[in-house]
């Protein structure tokens, strides 16, 4: 059984924790914004600065794609949008028109109509984590790590994860796949299949 010390060391969320976080984010006066913000950040592995700088022009709802401007000299690229992301974006963008400075180029606005800051994003995620009853201290970068671990757990190729997250150095990506216990499943069965005189 994992204790609180283990949870403090863990810097990613499990599938069920992500679901709880999204459910908590989808409440309150800014539910549409906070849910969309959290969902996109997890699905695409956004850094806080990247999601806060997301522009309206980066999103094409008809083509169902989003352009990711990676920071820290990462590789920028275009990602497909899932249907639930398209719906979340449509919901938020329709409500966004009632915010001050709705003509702004930035996708996510504060209640005063300013571009959402990293500090505000941190507060949103931290508050959602608390409302979800999660035992971890939640911060935005955990969503990026959660994306990497989720892809690795699904057996996605390391090189593809590297491109998806915009890593220039694959060593940053290997960290996700190296922690995936699933890659070892059946390893002894495969070994027995290759050797006539197996030990086990």
UniProtKB/Swiss-Prot annotation:
Gene3D superfamilies: Intergrase catalytic core. This is Type 1 fimbriae regulatory protein FimB. GO terms for molecular function: DNA binding; sequence-specific DNA binding; tyrosine-based site-specific recombinase activity. Belongs to the 'phage' integrase family. Residues 8-189 form the Tyr recombinase domain. Keywords: DNA integration, DNA recombination, Fimbrium biogenesis, Transcription, Transcription regulation. The active site is at residues 47, 72, 141, 144, 167, 176. The keyword Transcription regulation applies. GO terms for cellular component: Holliday junction resolvase complex. InterPro entries: DNA_brk_join_enz (IPR011010), Integrase-like_cat_sf (IPR013762), Integrase_catalytic (IPR002104), Tyrosine_recombinase_XerCD (IPR050090). FimB is one of the 2 regulatory proteins which control the phase variation of type 1 fimbriae in E.coli. These proteins mediate the periodic inversion of a 300bp DNA segment that harbors the promoter for the fimbrial structural gene, FimA. FimB switches FimA on. GO terms for biological process: chromosome segregation; DNA damage response; DNA integration; DNA recombination; resolution of DNA recombination intermediates. It comes from the Bacteria. It comes from Escherichia coli (strain K12).
């Amino acid at each position: 059984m994992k204790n609180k010390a283990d949870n403090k060391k863990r810097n990613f969320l499990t599938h069920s924790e992500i679901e709880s976080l999204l459910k908590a984010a989808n409440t309150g006066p800014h539910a549409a914004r906070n849910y969309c913000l959290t969902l996109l950040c997890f699905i695409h592995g956004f850094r806080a600065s990247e999601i806060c700088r997301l522009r309206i022009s980066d999103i094409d709802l008809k083509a169902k794609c989003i352009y990711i401007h990676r920071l820290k000299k990462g590789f920028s690229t275009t990602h497909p949008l899932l249907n639930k992301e398209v719906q979340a974006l449509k919901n938020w963008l329709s409500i966004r028109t009632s915010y001050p400075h709705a003509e702004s180029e930035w996708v996510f606005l504060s209640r005063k109509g300013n571009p959402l800051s990293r500090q505000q994003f941190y507060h949103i995620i931290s508050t959602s984590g608390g409302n979800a009853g999660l035992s971890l201290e939640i911060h935005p970068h955990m969503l990026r790590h959660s994306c990497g671990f989720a892809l690795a757990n699904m057996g996605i190729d390391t090189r593809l994860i590297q491109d998806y997250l915009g890593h220039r150095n694959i060593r940053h990506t290997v960290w996700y796949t190296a922690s995936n216990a699933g890659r070892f499943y059946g390893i002894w069965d495969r070994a027995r299949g290759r050797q006539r005189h197996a030990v086990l």
